C-alpha cells in the first residue's frame, strides 16, 4: 500500500456484516462512536439516498451529499457537517477530495472503493493536521480485503448492545437575509446576543451568502431563541429565521 494510506495516524479495521445488506451493521458501528465526525462512503448516489433514509428512520442525525443534488442542498449539507450540526456525512466519492472538511475522525467504507486511488483519497479525509483517525471497511461474507491493503487488518467486533450516539451539540439556523441586504457576520452575532439572549459560547460558525445566511447555535438554546426573536427585525428588516432543513 502506498505511504499515503499507511500512516501510523490511521487505524484500519474490518467490520463483518452477516448479510449483503449492511444497513444494520452500519448503524451498530455508528452507535459505537462516542464522539467525532464520520464520513460514510458509498459507491452510488442511490446508495447514499438509501442509507440516508435508513438513518433517518433510526432518528440518527446525518447529512447526505452527492452530485445528483442541487448545489444549494450540497452546500447546506457540508455547512451543517462542518459546523457540528451533524456528525455524520453519507456521500459518494465526491466528498473524497477537494473539499475543506477538517477534523474527520472516522471513515466508513460502506462499499469497497473501486480502486486504490479512491481508497487513498477517502482515507485521506481523516488524520489530518497531526490528528488521529480510523478507517472501517464493512465486508459481507463474499467480499474480500482489497489486494492493495497488504498488511493484516484487525477485525472490529461490534458489541451486542451499544447506546445511541450523542446528538450534535449544534443546530443550524437559516436567516433569510445576506450580503445583498448589507448583512454581515457581526450583524448576525450582535442580533443573536442582543435580541436572543445568547452568549458568545452559544454561537458557532456564521456563513453569509448573497441572499441568506446560516448560523450554528447550541442545540439546547434554539427553541427559546426562536421564541425571543420571532417578531424582531435585523437591521430594521423583517426576515425568516428557522431551523435549516
Q: What role is predicted for each listed range?
A:
Residues 1-73, 110, 138-151:
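Interdomain coupling/hinge region of P-loop NTPase helicase/AAA+ cores
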Amino acid at each position: 500500500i502506498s505511504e499515503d494510506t499507511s500512516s501510523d495516524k490511521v487505524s484500519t479495521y474490518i467490520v463483518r456484516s452477516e448479510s449483503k445488506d449492511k444497513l444494520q451493521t452500519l448503524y451498530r458501528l455508528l452507535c459505537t462512536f462516542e464522539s467525532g465526525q464520520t464520513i460514510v462512503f458509498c459507491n452510488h448516489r442511490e446508495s447514499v439516498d438509501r442509507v440516508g433514509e435508513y438513518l433517518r428512520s433510526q432518528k440518527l442525525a446525518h447529512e447526505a451529499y452527492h452530485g445528483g443534488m442541487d448545489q444549494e442542498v450540497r452546500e447546506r449539507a457540508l455547512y451543517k457537517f462542518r459546523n457540528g450540526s451533524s456528525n455524520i456525512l453519507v456521500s459518494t466519492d465526491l466528498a473524497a477530495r477537494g473539499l475543506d472538511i477538517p477534523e474527520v475522525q472516522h471513515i466508513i467504507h460502506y462499499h469497497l472503493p473501486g480502486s486504490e486511488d479512491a481508497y487513498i483519497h477517502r482515507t485521506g479525509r481523516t488524520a489530518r493536521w497531526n490528528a488521529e483517525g480510523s478507517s472501517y471497511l464493512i465486508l459481507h461474507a463474499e467480499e474480500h480485503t482489497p489486494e492493495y491493503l497488504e498488511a493484516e487488518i484487525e477485525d472490529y467486533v461490534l458489541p451486542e448492545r451499544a447506546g445511541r450516539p450523542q446528538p450534535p451539540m449544534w443546530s443550524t439556523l437559516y436567516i433569510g437575509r445576506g450580503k445583498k441586504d448589507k448583512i454581515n457576520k457581526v450583524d448576525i452575532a450582535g442580533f443573536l446576543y442582543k435580541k436572543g439572549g445568547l452568549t458568545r459560547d452559544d454561537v458557532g460558525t456564521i456563513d453569509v451568502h448573497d441572499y441568506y445566511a446560516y448560523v450554528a447555535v447550541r442545540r439546547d438554546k434554539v427553541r427559546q431563541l426562536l421564541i425571543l426573536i420571532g417578531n424582531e427585525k435585523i437591521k430594521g428588516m423583517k426576515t425568516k429565521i428557522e431551523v435549516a432543513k
